[in-house]
Amino acid sequence: MNSFDKLLTKPTSEIQEDVKGLFEKFNLRDNPFPSEPFVNKDANDDRINGKIFEMEIRKKEYEQMVNNFLKIPRNDPSHLRMGFIMDTSYIGRGNGKSAFLINLHRKINEGFALDISNNINKSFSVYLSPEPGGRTKTFSQLIDLFFKSILDSSIIKNCLAAIRLDALLSLTPDFNPSKHFKDESDLIEKLNSTEWLNENKINPGMLNKKILENKYLISLPKEFPLYEIQGSLLTPEVVTQDHFKEHYLNLKKGQERLEFIFSHLVDFFLAANFNGAFVLVDDFERIPDFQSARQKRDFALELRNCLYDGLYKNAKMGFYTFILVLHAGVPRLIQEAWSDSGMENRVPITPSRTITKHIIPFEKLNREHAVSLLKRYLSEYRIKDNEKRGRNDELFPFTEEAVYKIAEVSELNASKILKLSYDLLDKASTINEQEKIDEKFVEEIIDKNIMDSETKKSIASAETTDLLKKAQGD
């Protein structure tokens, strides 16, 4: 072989060009189900970040949320300041509460609840989940997490842009936003930029002076970021969300931070034309699970003080509505503290015949819900429209009977249904002749898994011989 042969010689085994993707025979570009069905709001994979969600299976719960909370005028003194999404299925974790909450959070923020409430309310949503292992045990720690979630949502940045636009239109009535901004995101970025304002001959100092004439901002302390960071008329700068973060971190834990969150920020949000906010607290049990009886009572007392009976602006008007997700058993954990602190009189943790609007029962799914759930996931990963296959094509390659079986063995638990569907589809993709997933295939795979599991247990528990001791004659 000369020096050029290796460049021109072809291998004897050629690559097959007509090879199909692993799930292509099922008209899918990938396995649409999550391999580990745990929800992570910030993940890039839509299978686990909650974006693939069939709201129809939680239509009842969503309508209760809309009618009991989102549509009630915030100026109604009896509007609810706290609510519970309470698991009544008793099937353990994985009933879809987190996915529901994340989608509710996104739905509220899409139109700031203006569309949902027919312009009665303008509210934003903040989603948070207490840290595991007892790291969110005190009310102060929860509030730190709450403010972090506010920052992550960029709602302060949004409000700063809204307040500046309002002031700019007052100072310059002929200012046309559509000529300067491509869309909402562009507007928010530019109105939070000192450089852009200067380039367009808009003095940030004069703009800030106009902003501070807002009736909700006049009473704020002079340490509040809008007052503290103004810049001079010669070297002006805009206040950014980072200034709010720095200000909060410089406040002492306890009263100073509570005053900022439940009074000063409320006035700031009101100045940006919001009249309410929903604080969605997932996995609430992570807090009382690690609290002593006294810590539970102190936590409930502070909650009552900030939401109902204290002197904070929020307690007076009910700007924030806290929605707590409670797994089965959590009410029993906090019932005594709720009663001792007086919270039971404000927002009963125990359902009654007369006061139930603040409690949204989260019930077990049924077989039809399981069918709708699988259809939703499958539709997100279709390679092409497949209407010609017939009425039940949306479920392909699953049959309806197969889904009923999956739901049955999964105890109607959403996470288990999705995980089993993932495993079945993954297995079927490796069997050339397996063109569909029917009830028989489901039973065969389940039986095989049970046998494999029992074999592993048998091996693990089998009597063993210590060969070293045997060789030594022991």
Which residues make up each language-model segment?
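A short, basic N-terminal segment
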Residues: 1-83, 176, 440-474
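A short acidic (Asp/Glu
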Residues: 94-102, 137-143, 288-294, 331-338, ...
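The catalytic "switch" region of P-loop NTPases
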Residues: 2-34, 60-64, 229, 233, ...
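Short, well-ordered amphipathic alpha-helices
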Residues: 64-70, 102-110, 303-308
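C-terminal alpha-helical "lid" subdomain
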Residues: 2-6, 364-372, 378-474
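Charge-rich, solvent-exposed alpha-helical interaction surfaces
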Residues: 18, 22, 65-68, 142-145, ...
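Glycine- and acidic
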Residues: 83-86, 285-291, 405-407
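P-loop NTPase nucleotide-binding core
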Residues: 75-273, 465-468
